[in-house]
Swiss-Prot record, chain B:
Organism field: Homo sapiens
Principal subcellular localization: other
Effect seen on changing residue 102 to S: No effect on STAMBP- and SMURF2-binding. No effect on ubiquitination by ITCH. No effect on STAMBP-binding
Protein name, as recorded: RING finger protein 11
InterPro entries: RNF11_RING-H2 (IPR042981), UEC_component (IPR052804), Znf_RING (IPR001841), Znf_RING/FYVE/PHD (IPR013083)
Gene (name only): RNF11
Effect seen on changing residue 4 to S: Change in subcellular location: Becomes partially cytosolic and retained in association with the Golgi apparatus. Partial reduction of ubiquitination
Chain intervals with Polar residues compositional bias: 1-12
Annotated phenotype, changing residue 40 to A: Loss of ITCH-, SMURF2- and WWP1-binding. Partial loss of ubiquitination by ITCH. No effect on STAMBP-binding. Persistent TNF-mediated NFKBIA phosphorylation. Loss of stimulus-dependent complex formation with TAX1BP1, TNFAIP3 and RIPK1
């Protein structure tokens, strides 16, 4: 299991049901799960 | 003259590998080479629904009965055939060039949805419309009752 998201990150789903990730500190969004980026 | 012709450095190559390894470690449900993810928004926008064409309610304000009706409506909409606009094909796309809901021309590759009356619209445009009024915007024909009954018996 990947464990909790790093601080400041939030997992969201877009209107097509695809999962993406939001970083409230840097205000960026990305498809990649930050937990799998090491 | 700038260094636009510089040979790839080890950094460039490692970056290449890095982006490939990123793709291998994606979260569920994401496609690597899709368009960029949605822009940053402080709060997740709460969906707004229309129990009747004249009413607008936050998803959190709907009664249980309204939630059920809207869920059924969404189910019905998903049953309607969808495709991609291709003027080259012989289908109804040949005649219809503009989405009358947004008044924009169809562009090759646009996601579209066909109604039983064979009028076509942008997928997002008609899905929004059908959530308010389950009729064809062009000919006002109610979406085929057969579609309704076949959905309810499943």
């Amino acid at each position: 299991p990947l464990g909790p998201l790093p601080p400041g990150w939030e997992k969201r789903t877009d209107s097509n049901g695809r999962v993406y990730f939001v970083n409230h500190n840097t205000r960026i969004t990305q498809w990649e799960d930050p937990r799998s980026q090491g | 003259m700038g260094n636009c012709l510089k040979s790839p450095t080890s950094d460039d190559i490692s970056l290449l590998h890095e982006s490939q390894s990123d793709r291998a470690s994606f979260g569920e449900g994401t496609e690597p080479d899709q368009e960029p993810p949605p822009p940053y928004q402080e709060q997740v926008p709460v969906p707004v629904y229309h129990p009747t064409p004249s009413q607008t309610r936050l998803a959190t304000q709907l009664t249980e009965e309204e939630q059920i009706r809207i869920a059924q409506r969404i189910g019905l909409i998903q049953h309607l055939p969808k495709g991609v606009y291709d003027p080259g094909r012989d289908g109804s796309e040949k005649k219809i060039r503009e989405c009358v809901i947004c008044m924009m021309d169809f562009v090759y590759g646009d996601p579209i949805r066909f109604l039983p009356c064979m009028h076509i619209y942008h997928l997002d445009c008609i899905d929004d419309w059908l959530m308010r009024s389950f009729t064809c915007p062009s000919c006002m024909e109610p979406v085929d009752a057969a579609l309704l009954s076949s959905y309810e018996t499943n």
